[in-house]
Amino acid sequence: MGPTKYIIIAVVIIIICVILGLYVVDKKAKEKLSEASKEARRLKEEAERDAEAKKKEAILEAKEEAHKLRAEVERENRERRNEVQRLERRIIQKEEALDKKSEALENKEEALNKKQQKIEDVETHMEELHEKQRTELERISGLTTEQAKEFLLEQVRKEVKHETAVMIKEIETKAKEEADKRAREVITYAIQRCAADHVAETTVHVVNLPNDEMKGRIIGREGRNIRTLETLTGVDLIIDDTPEAVILSGFDPIRREVARIALEKLIVDGRIHPARIEEMVEKAKKEVEISIKEEGEQATFETGIHGLHIELIRLLGRLKYRTSYGQNVLKHSIEVSHLAGLMASELGIDPTLAKRVGLLHDIGKAVDHEVEGPHAIIGSEIAKKYRESALVVNAIGAHHGDMEPQSLEAILVQAADAISAARPGARRETLEAYIKRLEKLEEIANECEGVEKSYAIQAGREIRIMVKPEVLDDTGCIEMARNIVKQIESELEYPGQIKVNVIRETRAIEYAK
């Protein structure tokens, strides 16, 4: 057999194999298709069964939900019916109550109508009686109704005028008493709250020396050292027998302070000659200037005043070295500031302005003697120059009456200034005058005939005189009081006014046995 035959046989075998393979594949495919169809039918049947079951379940759930909703609706309907029935019962009860009230009101209205009718009948009867009485009164009195009214009105008018005058007098008296009481309370409260320290200033200062040999060195050869120091400072040096002490005498406290500082530095340094004296005096002047500024700033700090011009602060510091009747002017100004502020607070006024004016009120005393005029006017011009407000300027100028006060603060500062200055002991000369005034008051009273005892009280503002009742009668007491007032006015100098109180007392004593 040749190769071609083998090839043909192989091809035939391959074709047969392919046909057999296709047959087998087709058969398997048909079997799978049949199985798939069966599976599909099975799945469909299961799905239909599941759907039917779910449908039945959903229907059951829907029926249950519907049943629940129906039950809820029925419950709500029952509750609403019950509420409606309850409201109906309440309405019926209210209607019954209203019917009862309406019936009661009708009964009351009927009773009121009857009473009204009775009242009208009584009024008619009263009018008839009144007319009869009026006619009878006119006949008896001989006056018409209008004349009687005019007479009564005139009598009432007179009584009202008298009562009004009495009432006005009582109100005025009470108002004055209340005002005096309130003023005393305000001033007393301010004085009690203000505790300022005062040191009576003098015109001399004592410098202690380590030994008496230092006196000769201070005097110097032919007195040139002491002359140089006196010339540069304007202060007199008194060197006497007082052991280990030199007295500086001068009316200008600033110069006296410069001399004190310079002399103490010279004593410590030990080199005392004209050139060294000049150097120390210059240093002392610079120290005093620094001290002046610090004192001014301290004063503003103590009083709580801010916004002052630097020159005003410097002038305030200079007040430390100014005295008025022995009273330090800076301490006095601080005290016036506190007093004015406290009184302003008690009266319901802003204390800031009052304290500012109180601190600056004596600023005119800080300038040198080259500036002429009252210190109040000078102070107001200085305040105006350094742009203080118009109220501050006016209050400074008015605190001694040189200008008309235009604010309550100005009046308060006047009062505070008088309180600070007039306090016994605040000023040396005032203390002496105070004691002399008390003695003179009692002397004037005791000179009068019939005086038993006399007492000067209220810091010399009142003299209380006890007289002998057998010597003077009431008229004589009045005459004595007038005479004493005239004598006081002619012989004494005093601030404000003095009350003369003459007391005559008669006692009758018997004993029952």
From Swiss-Prot:
EC primary class: hydrolase
Keywords for this protein: Cell membrane, Endonuclease, Hydrolase, Membrane, Nuclease, RNA-binding, Transmembrane, Transmembrane helix
Subcellular location: Cell membrane
Entry keyword annotation includes Transmembrane helix: yes
Pfam (any one): KH_1
Domain spans labelled HD: 329-422
Transmembrane segments: 6-26
Residue intervals of the KH domain: 203-288
SMART domains in the cross-refs: HDc (SM00471), KH (SM00322)
Entry EC no(s): 3.1.-.-
Main localization (coarse): membrane
UniProt keyword S-adenosyl-L-methionine, yes or no: no
InterPro entries from the UniProt entry: HD/PDEase_dom, HD_domain, HDIG_dom, KH_dom, KH_dom_type_1, KH_dom_type_1_sf, Ribonuclease_Y, RNase_Y_N
One Gene Ontology cellular component: plasma membrane
Gene Ontology annotations of biological process type: mRNA catabolic process
Bilayer topology: Single-pass membrane protein
GO molecular function, one term: RNA endonuclease activity
Disulfides per UniProt: none
Functional note: Endoribonuclease that initiates mRNA decay.
Family statement: Belongs to the RNase Y family.
Full protein name: Ribonuclease Y
Organism of derivation: Clostridium botulinum (strain Loch Maree / Type A3)
